[in-house]
Amino acid sequence: MWAVLSLLCAGAWLLGPPACGASNLAVSSFEKLHFKSWMVQHQKKYSLEEYHHRLQVFVSNWRKINAHNAGNHTFKLGLNQFSDMSFDEIRHKYLWSEPQNCSATKGNYLRGTGPYPPSMDWRKKGNFVSPVKNQGSCGSCWTFSTTGALESAVAIATGKMLSLAEQQLVDCAQNFNNHGCQGGLPSQAFEYIRYNKGIMGEDTYPYKGQDDHCKFQPDKAIAFVKDVANITMNDEEAMVEAVALYNPVSFAFEVTNDFLMYRKGIYSSTSCHKTPDKVNHAVLAVGYGEENGIPYWIVKNSWGPQWGMNGYFLIERGKNMCGLAACASYPIPLV
């Protein structure tokens, strides 16, 4: 029986209490110039009062980024679309409020004994990984992890790449213990698609990034799930086998203070937990490899292609980093 998971789907850049911690910073003219350049890049406009607040938050973030990058780490941070946001705002807009019970995700995956290829990247095998999407300010990462895995599964089985409807999962999957923008689990979403007899395409059920009434039309379903492979909790080697031999794998992990501004490199953290009750963001492992003796996962995120490494990140493999092996699964498509 798995513990209760309290999931979020956006990440958390810990600024301390930003409203007070960042409000008294002495800002240089260079920092102001850099902020204005960032505003242009990200098409940001503020009132005069809000400008001063955003400037303080931005400078606080930027200084933390520079301090991190000056240290000896396996990954770098960088400015991105979240750089003018405080932790409280991120928590309000992105973090899930509904706890998720992983007891429904009991392991049924039987792994072999290997050996497995030293590296794998489904993106390089053909058109088997759909483009990076953007969940916006809705805790719907679980829907993007779900559709990404099923899009890959269908493409691997048929050679046809689909774009599936995350909004259908947001609106319609509540009976499988999912809660729209407040949270959910890919394993439960796969079960919903399986018993619901399909999921529609993005073109017929477009993404809104907010909770709405279910508008599923069975005759317009274009992808179906035959079964769900749920990997035994904390069996990271089974995740390697699944990604190597079968399909990209959906998983959840705990985002902590230094992840939101990730730019490149192999992410690792000493502040996150390895327990299933702390994971808070769902993503998709599309491959794995090793660099300078450090094994890593190649992971597709849902924060748009401008975030991280063109929408992807690397995270250390083999240590259950941030609980990433706690809740892993992938769909077996009905084709």
From Swiss-Prot:
Enzyme class: hydrolase
Disulfide cysteine pairs (residue numbers): 102-327, 138-181, 172-214, 272-322
Subcellular location: Lysosome
One example GO MF annotation: cysteine-type endopeptidase activator activity involved in apoptotic process
GO BP terms, alphabetized: bradykinin catabolic process; cellular response to thyroid hormone stimulus; dichotomous subdivision of terminal units involved in lung branching; ERK1 and ERK2 cascade; immune response; immune response-regulating signaling pathway; lysosomal protein catabolic process; membrane protein proteolysis
EC number: 3.4.22.16
Full protein name: Pro-cathepsin H
Keyword field: Disulfide bond, Glycoprotein, Hydrolase, Lysosome, Protease, Signal, Thiol protease, Zymogen
Family: Belongs to the peptidase C1 family.
UniProt keyword annotation of Transcription regulation present: no
Secretion signal span: 1-22
